[in-house]
């Protein structure tokens, strides 16, 4: 959790007090809210170098993790039912993985070293033909450990079969 950027907070305050309409509504406030969302998507898409249609706004991190993990798992289950994460993930990820386990997916929880970092050798050993997704947080929210995300990405990219990578 980080402090909100001051300009972003000012913009959100204005949106919540002035442009508070339902963006799906046809009245003035709704149209203004929809325009604000389109403007935000355009700015974010440009910054992230993605298409606007690739961006989804959710209510927060837990909903985003659920959408990504559960959605990707079910959408790709024909390719495999094995998922990999770490033992120190955010509770939202761990709960999503628990749910997926109850739905018949096989979950591997990677251990971390004394600094809270995943060992690439452990990840490589855990990968199997049935693996469809790896989820590793970039910076741990409790201890601040940084995971080797670039190295994990390269490892997964070099696999014969594509594996989704959730960070």
Segments from the language model and where they lie:
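Pyridoxal 5′-phosphate
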Residues: 1-167
């Amino acid at each position: 959790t980080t402090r909100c950027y001051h300009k972003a907070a000012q913009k959100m305050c204005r949106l919540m007090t002035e442009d508070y309409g339902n963006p799906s509504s046809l009245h003035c406030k709704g149209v203004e809210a929809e325009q604000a969302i389109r403007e935000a998507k355009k700015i974010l898409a440009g910054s992230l170098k993605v298409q606007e249609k690739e961006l989804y706004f959710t209510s927060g991190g837990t909903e985003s993790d659920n959408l990504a993990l559960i959605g990707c798992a079910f959408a790709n289950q024909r390719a495999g039912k094995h998922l990999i994460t770490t033992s120190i993930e955010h509770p939202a990820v761990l709960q999503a993985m628990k749910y997926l386990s109850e739905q018949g997916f096989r979950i591997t929880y990677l251990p971390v070293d004394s600094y809270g970092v995943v060992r690439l050798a452990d990840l490589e050993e855990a990968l199997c033909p049935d693996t469809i997704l790896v989820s590793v947080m970039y910076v741990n929210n409790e201890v601040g450990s940084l995971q080797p995300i670039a190295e994990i990405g390269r490892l997964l990219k070099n696999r014969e079969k594509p594996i989704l990578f959730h960070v």
